[in-house]
A protein has these predicted regions:
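Secretory/extracellular carbohydrate-interaction modules
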Residues: 10-86
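Short strand-edge motifs at loop-to-beta-strand transitions and within beta-strands
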Residues: 26, 111, 248-252
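Extracellular/lumenal carbohydrate-interaction signature centered on repeated Trp-anchored short motifs
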Residues: 27-41, 101-111, 178-181
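Short, composition-biased motifs enriched in small/polar/acidic residues
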Residues: 196-267
Length: 267
């Protein structure tokens, strides 16, 4: 319970991580040391409460090496001066070698965050970072990433000699929201590996007399059964019939008439 689902993404499962303003640093070893190429990561993020003390700039997550304080693809957060917040990306210490996304996010909103750290060989300050916030679901699983929300920042800041772990962190009440939730952390070498698309379950029809049951498995939550009077041109909307659980399936009973009704599952 409490998982953060991202529409179009593979279903969330297992536990999520919740933290508050209490200072902490959770460093997760990757099991390898990367010194070349690219590293991608993704996770779902929801801020449940900002808190009255949250007035500064904080760091939520990113990649690093060992127990040091030099970071790469660092996900930053700040209040927008109203009732929401903004996310940014930077490399090294502070936020000088980075940028802020223009998006204003609200408390309770689930955000899909994708980051990348790219090793460049020319100098000790030329590695770059990129950030995607809520990328279009049509890009999930693609070979080539879509255009980034923040593209290729970090040049000029100190490079990481290697990347061997991912971290989540909290600083203090002034730099960390009062309550945050993250879920479905994925780390890989390609965009596709951290944006696996949801597999649409099969929709079955079982008829009996003048009624029929539409069935799909309960292990594929997050899908909405929609209907339309035409496949191509008419709008789609959620069915009005109640959805019930029938064993290992969700089930909707419909009356069979002479009117055309088309059905689909949408995540």
């Amino acid at each position: 319970p409490g998982n953060l689902d991202v529409p179009g993404l593979a279903f969330a499962a297992g536990n999520c991580l919740t933290w508050t303003t209490q200072p902490m640093s959770l460093r997760l070893p990757l099991g390898t040391n990367l010194t070349t190429g690219e590293l991608f990561f993704s996770f779902a993020l929801r801020v449940d409460a900002l808190g009255p003390s949250f007035t500064g700039v904080g760091t939520l997550a990113g990649v690093t090496t060992g127990t040091g304080t030099l970071f790469g693809s660092k996900i930053n957060i700040r209040t927008n001066g109203s009732v929401g917040f903004q996310l940014g990306l930077s490399k090294a210490t502070g936020t000088a070698y980075g940028a802020w996304a223009p998006d204003d996010f609200a408390v309770g909103e689930t955000i899909f965050v994708v980051g990348r750290y790219r090793f460049n060989p020319s100098s000790d300050t030329d590695d770059t970072c990129a950030l995607w916030l809520n990328p279009d679901r049509t890009s999930f699983g693609a070979i080539v990433p879509p255009s980034a929300t923040i593209a290729e920042v970090g040049a000029g800041g100190a490079d990481l000699p290697q990347v061997d772990r991912f971290f989540f962190r909290a600083g203090s009440g002034s730099t960390t929201p009062a309550k945050l939730v993250t879920d479905e952390l994925r780390i890989g070498l390609t965009w596709a590996s951290v944006t696996p698309p949801a597999v649409v379950p099969a929709l079955r029809l079982v008829s009996s007399g003048d009624t029929a049951a539409l069935l799909w498995p309960t292990n594929a939550p997050g899908f909405v059964l929609e209907e339309s009077s035409a496949v191509m041109s008419a709008p789609w909307f959620a069915v009005s019939e109640p959805i019930r659980t029938n064993g290992v399936n969700f089930s909707v009973d419909i009356s069979l008439t002479n009117n055309s009704r088309y059905f689909r599952l949408r995540h």
